[in-house]
C-alpha cells in the first residue's frame, strides 16, 4: 500500500472530536449493537408454512409472497475472505433486504461447501483430521460474514460435511442409482423422456414387454443375480463403468473431463493425465442432454452462460449406422455415429479407437497383400494392436485429437462392410478416435473431411468425392480433386447411388439432392433396411462420479462376494467416513501411466468388510472405497435451506412449493426454482450443469415440482487489485510499497524497501501478496462503509479495481448523512418536522422513483449516486426535514443497514427498519425538471448524472468528482470547469 493509501486509511480515525462524530470506532459499536439485536430478535428469520421453522417473529408466511435469494456458497478455506470475495454476498444481501421491505417473505441463508481437496491435503501434511481444520475454517468465515451484517436466517445454516446433510446426499445418490431413463415416457413437464424407478424396467423384463439385451429369448427369472445386475447396470442413471478415464498418478485419483486442462494436465497441481480403462462410478447425464439444452429457454440466465452450456452439451443431429465386421470369431457389429450420413457412399475405410472392443478379435496373421506401411513394422496384427494400444495410453486426449499433430494409425487386419454399398472397408485403429466420444468408431470419408483425407494420403487409401459445390457458388470440384477434401454442408450430392441388387434394402440414389435433403432420405433408407436410424448425439460425456480420496461422501453401496453391488437401505444412512491411518490416496510418479488407484478408505479393513442382513440373511459384504466428488454436496444444497431441521424429508413438498414451485411468485414462471442465484461465471459448466441434472432426475421421480433449480442467475464481476514485483519478478507485499514521483512519461513510480518495484493489475490473492481483508475494513472504516464502497464501485456484473484510498469517499457520505440527523457535539437529533419545500419534494420523489428502479434492476451503484444527490441537497438546507431524511434512510438501509438502523431508532422508531415499508413516490412530483449532466475527463464522457435544472454549480462539481473518483485515483484534479446544469469538464493532475 502506498503512503497516500496509508494516510487515507488512517484519516477517519485521526480525529476523536467532536464526541459524536461518525468514525470507525463509533461505527464498530453501532454495528456490533445491531448485529446482536438482529440475532436476539430473529429479525431475518424466514417463516416456513409449517414445521420447526414456521416462526417468522411476527412476519409469518401466510399471505406473503416468498422470495428466495442465495449465493454460491463458499469453500471454507483457511485463508478466510479477502475484500474480493464478498461482492456477490453483499449484492444478494442488498436484494434480500430490499425485498423484505417490499413485504415479501425472504429466505436468505448461507451454508458451506466443506468437502474438498485443500482440507485433505492439510490433513495429509499434519495428520489432523480434515473435519477439525474445516470446522475451524467455517467458524472463522462465519465470523467474517456475520461482522459484515449479512441478513442471514442462521437457523438454516449447514455444511455439506454434517452427517445429517451427508445422509440426504447419499439418499439422492440412491434414488439416482435406483432409476433409469425411459425415452418413451412423458415427464411431468409434458415432454418426452423421464427417469423412472428401476423396478419399472424389471417389470418390463419380467413381462416380456422389453427384450433383455444380451439375453434375447431368455426369461428374466432365468438370469442369475449377477447377470441381472449387469443388465440393470447398463440402464441405471448411476452406474459402474469400465471405460477410459483420466488417470492422474501424481494426484492418485481419477479426474472428470472438466478437471483436465486443455493441455492434458490436472487442473489442480498440473500433473500429467493418462487415458486408462478403470472401474468407476458414472452418472448418465447424457440421457438428459436434450432437456438440459431445451429448458434453458425457460430460465432467466445470462446468455453467455446459456451459450457455454449449449456448447458444452454439444447436441448434434445425424445417424447411427451399423457396419458388419468380419473377424475370426464371426461377424461383429460396429456402430458409428455420423452427422453426415449422406457421405456413406464416400466411405473408403473405417477407424476405431485403440480401446475399442473389436480389437479383441484381430486375426493371428496379416491378410494377403496387406501393404507394409499398414503394418507398422509388426509381424502380426496382434503384436501391432498391443503395441499401438500401449503407445496411445501414454498420450493425453488433447495430444490424440490435435489437428496439427502427425496422424498415426495401423491396419487391424479386419474389414468392415459398408451397409449400403457392400464394399469391404479396411479397418484401422488410430489414436485420434476417442472411445468416450461417440461410439469409439468412425466411418472415414476422405473426400469430405481434412483429417480423413490426410490419413488416406498417408496410407494410400482411395478418395471418393460425394458432394460438389453449388452451381451458384462459382466454385468447382476440380479445384479440390487430388488436392484437398471438399468440406462443406452446402453442396450437391454426387457419386451416391446404388441399385437394389447390390444393396441390403431398396435401391437408393442421392445424386442431385442438396445435402440436407440427402440426409433425410438416407436416414429413412437406413431405418427401413434395419442398419441404422437418424439420431442425436452429444459432445457431453457421462459424468465420472468417483474419486480415490478420503474427504468426500462414501457411497451407500456394498458388494457381495461375487462383486455384485447392493444398495444399502435408507435407514442405514448416513454412511460416515471411518478413521484411517493415512488420509492421502497413494500417489505415484506423475509419469507412471501403469499405476493403479489405491483409495485411503481401503486401509480401514474393519470398515470395508461388514456383516449385513439385506433381506436374505446375514452375509459378508464389502463397502465401496471410493468417495463422491466435491460436486455432490453442491448439487442440491439450495433445497436444504428450505428446512435443514427436517429429518424425515430431503425437502417437504409444501415448503418446496412455497419457496421454489412453479409460479410461486410473480416472476418465478413455469420453471420455478430459486428466485435469485448469484455467483461467478466460472461455475457455468460444472456446478450449474450438475445441479440441473440432479434436479431434473428428482423432478421426474416426483420429489420436487419445479423443472429447474435456479430461475434467475446473476454473475458478479471480480474485484481486482494492483500487485507489485521486485526486479527478480518476485511478488512483494503491496502494503509495504511506497508510491514515488512520476517518471518522465508521467507514470507513477514505486519502491519497496528502497528498491524499485513494478506494478501490475489483476487478481487479488495470497500468492500475489496484495490481499486486503474485510477485517481490515471493519477496523479502519466499519462494515457499512465497506458495504457502501463495494456496492458503489461500478456495475455488479463488471470487474472493477480496488483502491483503498477511495473508501474514504464512502465514509464521508455516511458522515454527512449522520450529521444531517445527529448533532456531532451533543449527540442529539437535529431534524425538524416542517413541511418540504417544492424543490425538496420534487427531488425526494424523483429519488424514490429512480432508486426503486435501480434496486429492481440490481444497480446499487447508480442507486447510491442518486442517494448522494439527495443527501447533499439536505445538507444544503438550514434545517433537515424528517419527511425527507426518513425515506433517505430507508432507501439506503439495504446497502448500509447498521447506521440506518441506528438513525431510524434515534428518530423515535421502536421497530427495526428491516421490515419497514419501502418508500413510495408521489407520482405528482415524479419526472419533473430533470436534466442530464455529462462529466468529461480529457474530453471523454466518463459519467452521466440526472440533476435539477437549477442545481448549484458547486453542488454539481461535488457530484461529478464523486462520480469519477475511481478514475482520478484519489488525486485532486488540476482544473474543473462547470457549466451547470449540463457539463462538467475535468482536467486531471499530471
Predicted feature descriptions by range:
Residues 2-27, 32-33, 37-41, 45, ...:
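Residue patterns forming the tRNA-binding/recognition surfaces of aminoacyl-tRNA synthetases
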Residues 282-316, 357-410, 573-606, 888-917:
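Amphipathic alpha-helical
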Residues 1-62, 371, 462-473, 481-484, ...:
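Basic, alpha-helical terminal appendages of large translation-related enzymes
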Residues 92-93, 105, 360-470, 475, ...:
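Catalytic alpha/beta core of large soluble enzyme barrels
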Residues 52-134, 158-169, 336-339, 418-455, ...:
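N-terminal catalytic cores of NTP/NDP-binding nucleotidyl/phosphoryl-transfer enzymes
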Residues 150, 414-420, 424-437, 466, ...:
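Alpha-helical recognition segments enriched in aromatics with Gly/Pro capping
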Residues 113, 184-191, 234, 239-246, ...:
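Helix-rich, typically C-terminal accessory recognition domains appended to large enzymatic cores
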Residues 2-11, 15-70, 100-109, 133-139, ...:
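Conserved oxyanion/phosphate-binding beta-strand-loop segments in alpha/beta enzyme cores
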Amino acid at each position: 500500500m502506498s503512503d497516500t493509501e496509508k494516510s487515507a486509511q488512517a484519516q477517519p480515525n485521526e480525529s476523536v472530536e467532536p464526541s459524536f462524530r461518525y468514525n470507525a470506532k463509533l461505527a464498530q459499536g453501532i454495528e456490533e449493537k445491531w448485529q446482536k439485536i438482529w440475532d436476539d430478535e430473529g429479525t431475518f428469520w424466514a417463516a416456513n408454512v409449517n414445521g420447526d421453522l414456521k416462526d417468522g417473529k411476527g412476519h409469518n408466511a401466510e399471505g406473503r409472497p416468498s422470495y428466495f435469494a442465495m449465493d454460491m456458497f463458499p469453500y471454507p478455506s483457511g485463508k478466510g475472505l479477502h475484500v474480493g470475495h464478498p461482492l456477490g454476498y453483499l449484492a444478494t444481501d442488498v436484494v434480500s433486504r430490499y425485498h423484505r421491505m417490499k413485504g415479501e417473505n425472504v429466505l436468505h441463508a448461507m451454508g458451506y461447501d466443506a468437502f474438498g481437496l485443500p482440507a485433505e491435503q492439510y490433513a495429509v501434511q499434519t495428520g489432523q483430521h480434515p473435519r477439525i481444520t474445516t470446522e475451524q475454517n467455517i467458524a472463522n468465515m462465519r465470523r467474517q460474514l456475520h461482522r459484515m451484517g449479512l441478513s442471514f436466517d442462521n437457523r438454516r445454516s449447514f455444511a455439506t460435511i454434517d452427517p445429517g446433510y451427508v445422509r440426504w446426499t447419499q439418499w439422492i445418490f440412491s434414488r439416482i442409482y435406483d432409476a433409469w431413463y425411459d425415452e418413451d415416457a412423458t415427464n411431468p413437464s409434458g415432454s418426452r423422456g423421464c427417469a423412472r424407478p428401476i423396478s419399472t424396467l424389471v417389470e418390463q423384463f419380467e413381462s416380456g414387454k422389453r427384450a433383455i439385451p444380451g439375453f434375447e429369448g431368455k426369461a428374466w427369472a432365468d438370469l442369475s443375480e449377477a447377470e441381472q445386475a449387469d443388465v440393470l447396470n447398463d440402464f441405471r442413471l448411476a452406474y459402474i463403468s469400465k471405460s477410459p478415464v483420466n488417470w492422474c498418478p501424481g494426484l492418485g485419483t481419477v479426474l472428470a473431463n472438466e478437471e483436465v486442462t486443455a493441455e492434458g494436465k490436472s487442473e489442480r497441481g498440473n500433473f500429467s493425465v493418462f487415458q486408462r480403462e478403470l472401474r468407476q462410478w458414472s452418472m448418465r447425464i447424457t440421457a438428459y442432454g436434450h432437456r438440459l439444452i431445451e429448458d434453458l429457454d425457460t430460465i432467466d440466465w445470462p446468455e453467455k452462460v446459456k451459450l457455454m452450456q449449449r456448447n458444452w452439451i454439444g447436441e448434434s443431429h445425424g445417424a447411427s449406422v451399423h457396419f458388419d465386421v468380419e473377424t475370426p470369431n464371426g461377424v461383429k457389429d460396429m456402430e458409428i455415429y455420423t452427422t453426415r450420413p449422406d457421405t456413406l457412399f464416400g466411405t473408403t475405410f473405417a477407424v476405431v479407437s485403440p480401446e475399442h472392443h473389436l480389437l479383441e478379435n484381430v486375426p493371428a496373421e496379416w491378410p494377403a497383400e496387406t501393404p507394409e506401411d499398414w503394418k507398422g513394422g509388426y509381424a502380426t496384427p496382434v503384436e501391432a494392436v498391443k503395441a499401438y494400444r500401449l503407445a496411445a495410453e501414454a498420450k493425453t486426449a488433447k495430444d490424440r485429437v490435435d489437428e496439427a499433430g502427425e496422424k498415426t494409425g495401423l491396419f487391424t487386419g479386419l474389414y468392415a462392410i459398408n451397409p449400403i454399398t457392400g464394399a469391404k472397408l479396411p479397418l484401422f485403429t488410430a489414436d485420434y478416435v476417442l472411445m468416450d466420444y461417440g461410439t469409439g468408431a468412425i466411418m472415414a470419408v476422405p473426400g469430405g473431411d481434412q483429417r480423413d483425407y490426410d490419413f488416406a494420403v498417408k496410407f494410400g487409401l482411395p478418395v471418393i468425392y460425394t458432394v460438389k459445390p453449388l452451381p451458384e457458388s462459382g466454385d468447382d470440384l476440380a479445384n479440390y480433386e487430388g488436392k484437398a477434401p471438399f468440406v462443406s454442408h452446402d453442396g450437391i450430392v454426387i457419386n451416391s447411388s446404388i441399385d437394389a441388387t447390390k444393396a441390403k434394402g431398396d435401391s437408393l440414389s442421392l445424386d442431385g439432392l442438396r445435402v440436407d435433403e440427402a440426409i433425410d432420405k438416407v436416414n429413412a433408407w437406413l431405418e427401413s433396411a434395419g442398419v441404422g436410424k437418424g439420431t442425436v448425439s452429444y459432445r457431453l460425456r457421462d459424468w465420472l462420479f468417483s474419486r480415490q480420496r478420503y474427504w468426500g461422501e462414501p457411497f451407500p453401496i456394498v458388494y457381495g462376494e461375487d462383486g455384485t453391488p447392493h444398495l444399502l437401505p435408507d435407514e442405514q444412512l448416513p454412511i460416515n467416513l471411518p478413521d484411517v491411518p493415512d488420509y492421502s490416496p497413494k500417489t505415484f510418479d506423475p509419469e507412471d501411466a501403469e499405476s493403479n488407484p489405491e483409495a485411503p478408505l481401503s486401509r480401514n479393513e474393519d470398515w470395508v468388510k461388514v456383516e449385513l442382513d439385506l433381506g436374505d440373511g446375514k452375509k459378508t459384504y464389502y463397502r465401496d472405497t471410493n468417495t463422491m466428488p466435491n460436486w455432490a454436496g453442491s448439487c442440491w444444497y439450495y433445497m436444504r435451506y428450505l428446512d435443514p431441521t427436517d429429518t424425515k424429508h430431503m425437502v417437504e413438498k409444501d415448503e418446496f412449493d412455497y419457496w421454489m414451485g412453479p409460479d410461486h411468485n410473480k416472476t418465478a414462471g413455469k420453471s420455478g426454482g430459486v428466485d435469485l442465484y448469484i455467483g461467478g461465471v466460472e461455475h457455468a459448466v460444472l456446478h450449474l450443469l450438475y445441479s440441473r441434472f440432479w434436479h431434473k432426475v428428482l423432478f421426474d421421480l416426483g420429489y420436487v415440482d419445479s423443472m429447474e433449480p435456479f430461475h434467475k442467475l446473476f454473475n458478479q464481476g471480480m474485484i481486482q487489485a494492483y500487485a507489485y514485483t521486485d526486479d527478480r519478478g518476485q511478488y512483494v507485499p503491496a502494503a509495504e510499497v511506497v508510491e514515488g514521483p512520476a517518471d518522465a512519461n508521467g507514470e507513477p513510480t514505486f519502491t519497496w524497501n528502497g528498491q524499485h518495484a513494478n506494478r501490475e493489475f489483476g487478481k487479488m490473492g495470497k500468492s500475489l501478496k496484495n490481499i486486503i481483508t474485510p477485517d481490515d475494513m471493519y477496523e479502519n472504516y466499519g462494515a457499512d462503509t465497506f458495504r457502501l464502497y463495494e456496492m458503489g464501485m461500478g456495475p455488479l456484473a463488471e470487474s472493477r479495481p480496488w483502491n483503498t484510498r477511495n473508501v474514504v469517499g464512502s465514509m464521508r457520505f455516511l458522515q454527512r448523512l449522520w450529521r444531517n440527523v445527529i448533532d456531532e457535539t451533543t449527540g442529539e437529533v437535529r431534524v425538524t418536522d416542517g413541511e418540504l419545500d417544492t424543490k425538496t419534494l420534487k427531488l425526494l420523489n424523483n429519488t424514490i422513483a429512480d432508486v426503486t428502479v435501480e434496486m429492481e434492476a440490481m444497480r446499487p451503484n447508480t442507486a447510491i449516486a442518486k442517494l448522494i444527490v439527495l443527501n447533499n441537497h439536505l445538507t444544503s438546507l438550514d434545517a433537515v426535514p424528517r419527511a425527507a431524511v426518513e425515506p433517505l434512510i430507508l432507501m439506503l438501509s439495504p446497502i448500509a443497514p447498521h447506521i440506518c438502523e441506528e438513525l431510524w431508532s434515534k428518530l423515535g422508531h421502536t421497530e427495526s427498519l428491516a421490515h419497514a415499508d419501502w418508500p413510495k413516490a408521489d407520482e405528482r412530483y415524479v419526472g419533473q425538471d430533470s436534466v442530464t449532466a455529462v462529466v468529461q475527463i480529457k474530453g471523454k464522457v466518463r459519467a452521466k448524472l440526472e440533476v435539477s435544472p437549477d442545481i448549484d454549480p458547486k453542488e454539481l462539481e461535488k457530484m461529478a468528482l464523486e462520480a469519477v473518483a475511481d478514475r482520478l485515483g484519489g488525486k485532486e484534479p488540476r482544473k474543473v470547469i462547470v457549466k451547470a446544469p449540463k457539463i462538467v469538464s475535468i482536467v486531471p493532475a499530471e
